[in-house]
Amino acid sequence: MASERSPRDLYQLSIGYILILITVWTPNPYQRFFFWLSFAVVVGFCLQGRLRGEPLGLGFQGFLRSTWVIAIALMLSLLAIYFAIREHTVHYFFGHTIFGPRAWGYLVWATLQQFILQTFILTRLLRLFPERSTAILLAAFMFSLAHFPNMLLVATTLVWGIGSCALFLRYRNLYTVGIIHFVLGVTLAVSIPSDIHHNMRVGLGYYFYRPHHSVTLYRGINPKPISHR
């Protein structure tokens, strides 16, 4: 059965991933077209798999058992923000309050990224490679490569890609890894100066980043000015 699926899994994985890379490296307004094309293709392939009995990871099974991991992520987030406050680097999420629509929109985007990584990429790699560890490493590498040339995100998504794939295989729940992705991503965005992570941009957008003055979340701390030279 696995050998019959391998050719289909390979071409679906290749088509979907190539479209994702094209999207990342295409300028606007054409990028929007490729984004929705990639989205439709990936979701279409996953729905085909669902018709064959493959799980999408969108149920609530395993969520409650995995909430301890979310709790750890929240504690690490608070610790990172605490040190960022001490170093006067903490700032708003892309110039918006953390509870603004852009921040919460990132929760949807984070969960969608995990859907692509786990439901689309990892599921197919697990059928293409007999060793689970090989599939996890390849999935994490593909996830990381899509964040080039932002080397901070390349490194962090490689580590998170491995961790999130392991968590997904244990709990089979996308909401858990989506929430953790959101927590860690926002923490990274507000704790590290935008000049370093370029507003978390990847691909062609990384090179179009323009510095702007970040607004501190804690005005009473007298933050150090962030240089944009």
What do these predicted ranges mean?
Residues 2-50, 69:
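Alpha-helical transmembrane segments in multi-pass membrane proteins
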Residues 16-25, 75-84, 140-149, 183-193:
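Aromatic-anchored segments of alpha-helical transmembrane domains
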Residues 33-42, 99-104, 108, 112, ...:
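Membrane-embedded alpha-helical segments of multi-pass membrane proteins
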Residues 92-145:
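Function-critical hydrophobic alpha-helical transmembrane segments in multi-pass membrane proteins
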Residues 25-26, 44-54, 82-86, 167-170:
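Structural signal for the C-terminal ends of transmembrane alpha-helices
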Residues 10-14, 67-71, 100-103, 133-138, ...:
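Hydrophobic alpha-helical transmembrane segments
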